[in-house]
Regions:
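Catalytic metal- and UDP-sugar-binding loop of GT-A-like glycosyltransferases, i.e.
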Residues: 101
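Short, acidic, metal-binding catalytic loop of nucleotide-sugar glycosyltransferases
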Residues: 21-29
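Short aromatic/hydrophobic "clamp" motif used to bind/position activated sugar donors
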Residues: 98
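Active-site-proximal specificity loops/subdomain of glycosyltransferases
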Residues: 43-90
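Short internal beta-strands
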Residues: 31-38, 126-128
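Conserved donor-nucleotide/metal-binding helix-loop-beta segment in metal-dependent transferases, i.e.
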Residues: 105-142
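A recurrent flexible, glycine/aromatic-enriched loop bordering the glycosyltransferase active site
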Residues: 146-157
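A glycosyltransferase accessory/donor-loop signature
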Residues: 1-7, 162-282
Length: 282
């Protein structure tokens, strides 16, 4: 299973938390962890040791910003927004499929069902976040002029068909679109505007559960998608928004305690890994 992340040093522990949650809840197999980074992470050794303890292979990818010399770059549009969109240019060419995950997610059931989703005829698989009304969806379609897409996809969980993406997704198209449009969420807007019609929709209640909307999920499911249902069935919880469960404040929510449990286990894992020299970490 190939996993992709894009972080800086502030999110090493959060990334390790995601990895631990995947390892504990996904059937044993090989995990290859690719991490896009603007500069080599100062906590590279921490991450390497954690991956070794989890039995995962760690592949850091330092991004050369010269790749984006023709891209529109401003304070609002830093080069890092292009990493996810152009991951196929940065990853080894012999990779065929990879799952991108934001570092603010938690895996609570087997990830294999998402990873094994067929992408035949599609560039990506992603989820559209549920709402009680479709007002936001209509606004986004008008804003991005992508009326033939199923909806507005959240790019925090993105299964990538790299072989097809390499043929269809071009940096010049992305740069030109950003240059000629004012965007709210630059990389996510580009993904939806240019490639929304080529994204396979997967259920957000399973693969990209927005933890802010637990009440909405229960309402639209007529009471079926309760906390117990989520714990049995949902694969990925996504801690969207400004409130984050690892913050000392602004960390309320029905799934905060669950995250804190994994986060605490991760800190213990990191501490244990630091006590061992690299050659003794298995």
């Amino acid at each position: 299973m190939n996993l992709l992340f894009s972080i800086n040093d502030k999110f090493v522990t959060q990334l390790a938390t995601v990895l631990l949650s995947i390892k504990l809840n996904t059937q044993a197999q090989e995990f290859n962890v690719y991490v896009l980074q603007k500069e080599k992470l100062k906590r590279t050794e921490d991450l390497e040791r954690v991956c070794k303890q989890l039995g995962m292979n760690y592949f850091p990818i330092k991004v050369n910003d010269q790749l984006f010399s023709k891209a529109p770059v401003t304070d609002r549009y830093p080069t890092t927004i292009y990493y996810r969109l152009l991951a196929h240019c940065l990853l080894p060419q012999d990779l065929h499929k990879i799952l991108y995950l934001d570092a603010d997610v938690l895996c609570i059931n087997d990830l294999s069902s998402l990873y094994e989703t067929s992408l035949e005829g599609y560039l990506y698989a992603s989820a559209i976040h549920t709402n009680l009304t479709n007002t936001t969806e209509v606004i986004n379609k008008i804003r991005l002029q992508n009326f033939d897409a199923d909806g507005y996809y959240n790019s925090g969980v993105l299964l990538m068909n790299l072989d097809t993406i390499r043929k269809k997704v071009k940096d010049t198209d992305i740069f030109n679109y950003i240059r000629t449009h004012t965007l709210l969420l630059p990389d996510q807007d580009v993904l939806n505007a240019l490639y929304g019609r080529y994204i396979k929709s997967v259920p957000d209640q399973l693969y990209n559960f927005d933890i802010r909307k637990g009440g909405i999920y229960e309402t639209i499911s007529f009471g079926e998608w309760t906390n117990d249902w989520v714990m049995r069935n949902t694969v990925i919880l996504h801690y969207c928004g400004r409130d984050k469960p690892w913050l000392p404040t602004k960390n309320s929510g029905r799934y905060t305690a669950l995250y804190k449990n994994y986060f605490q286990m991760t800190n213990k894992l990191i501490s244990a890994a630091l006590l061992l020299p690299p050659e003794e970490v298995n």
